């Protein structure tokens, strides 16, 4: 088991020595954790909460993130897919859609190497597409933190209670 784990780490390191790829992937992993924990932590009754009438509900914000990730990460993999999270309303369905989008993004990140990072997919490089997705996810998570605070819940990124 240990040998297989070490082989996987060595394989990952063999794919890229580019610090930009490694650092951006680390940022992706971080926001993935925050968003996953946020989706789980928000009570289902608050998925319909809107801080003001003209902005998205918490559930719609989560759907927007999942659909954006599906679109961008599948594009980086070479075959753009449209997400279906916007058609979902229950917490379970939205959490599942978010998980599916992360599976697509994990595959996209696993596919990035020094050799293919600058290959163009549409108007951006593969790496540029993934960087844009990380930027968008962080921006949307920032909005999401406000929903948590307005409901009296500590957002995952600032929760120091040890919950991971």
Which residue stretches match the model-derived regions?
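Bacterial N-terminal signal peptides
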Residues: 1-9
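Sec/Tat signal peptide C-region and signal peptidase I cleavage site
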Residues: 10-14
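Cleaved targeting-peptide boundary
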Residues: 15-21
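Short, contiguous alpha-helical
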Residues: 25-29, 33-36, 44-84, 122-164
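Alpha-helical packing segments of well-folded alpha/beta enzyme cores
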Residues: 27, 31-34, 38, 94-108, ...
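Short, polar/acidic, helix-capping and beta-turn segments at strand->helix junctions
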Residues: 41
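Acidic/histidine-rich alpha-helical segments that form the ligand environment
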Residues: 87-138
């Amino acid at each position: 088991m240990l040998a297989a784990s070490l082989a996987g780490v060595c394989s990952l390191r063999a794919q890229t020595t580019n610090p930009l790829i490694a650092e951006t992937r680390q940022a992706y992993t971080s926001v993935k954790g925050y968003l996953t924990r946020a989706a789980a932590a928000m009570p289902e009754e608050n998925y319909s909460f809107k801080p003001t009438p003209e902005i998205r509900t918490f559930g719609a914000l989560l759907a927007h993130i999942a659909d954006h990730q599906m679109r961008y990460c599948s594009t980086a993999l070479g075959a753009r897919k449209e997400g279906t999270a916007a058609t979902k309303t229950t917490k379970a369905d939205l959490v599942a859609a978010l998980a599916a989008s992360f599976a697509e993004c994990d595959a996209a990140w696993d596919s990035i190497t020094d050799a293919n990072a600058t290959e163009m997919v549409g108007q951006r490089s593969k790496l540029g597409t993934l960087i844009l997705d990380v930027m968008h996810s962080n921006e949307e998570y920032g909005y999401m933190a406000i929903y948590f605070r307005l409901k009296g819940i500590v957002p995952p990124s600032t929760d120091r209670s040890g919950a991971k």
